[in-house]
Amino acid sequence: ASASTESKWNISIRQLVTGANPMDILAVQEAGVLPSTAIMTPRQVQPVGVGIPIHEYEWNLGSSSRPNSVYIYYSRVDVGANRVNMAIVSRMRADEVYVLPPPTVASRPIIGIRIGNDAFFSIHALSRGGNDGGAIVSAVDMHFRNMPHINWMIMGDFNRTPGSLIGLLDPDLRSRINVVSPPSFTQTSGNTIDYAITGNSSTTSLYDPPRILAILAVAGLRTFLASD
């Protein structure tokens, strides 16, 4: 996902959200710079007390007479190179926006949105092994500990396989999550490191994973959006 970012948005991502079987929610790592046609809205979506900026943009993929807008929630975490900025694209406007602080000193922040009782997060674990992957899942779980009505999904580049990620989690958390992997590998070396984790933070009821088809960005356009 390191091609020219403007073309990445205008070709790959546009195709994923407007083509056949368009995606409702798309998690974008290495989001680079947003397309010039994405307009920042005046809505204040910044969570109180978290100093990591996030903004809402409206991106019209149709025309002025026949608009077809999606919303982009964009956090410029990479102020220097602009390469590893984070984004979530949604066909529906978010009811709430989340920015969870980096779970370890070296980690990136965790950004997310809530639509109804469903929360979606875009994450990018540390390179060379994704050692903070377990901390990322635990941080999301802890955030919703007193909100058992919320189902959450963490999507992105975990930089480690699902099996090795599960090994980082405590047994209680393992019983409340489900891994949703794309049908083919997502890294040129043949590993699957881009996938989703669904879960619920209720510790009193049995977790029943949602029936999710290929919601992952990497499943639809692996050649464009797979990891290096």
Regions of interest found by a model, annotated:
Residues A1-L16, I25, G80-D228:
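Active-site regions of metal-assisted phosphoester/phosphodiester hydrolases
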Residues A1-N68, R83:
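N-terminal, active-site-proximal structural segment of metallo-dependent hydrolase catalytic domains
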Residues E30, S75-R76, G156:
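Short glycine-centered, acidic/aromatic-flanked micro-motifs in structured strand/loop junctions
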Residues R66-V79:
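Conserved catalytic-core segment of clan PA serine endopeptidases
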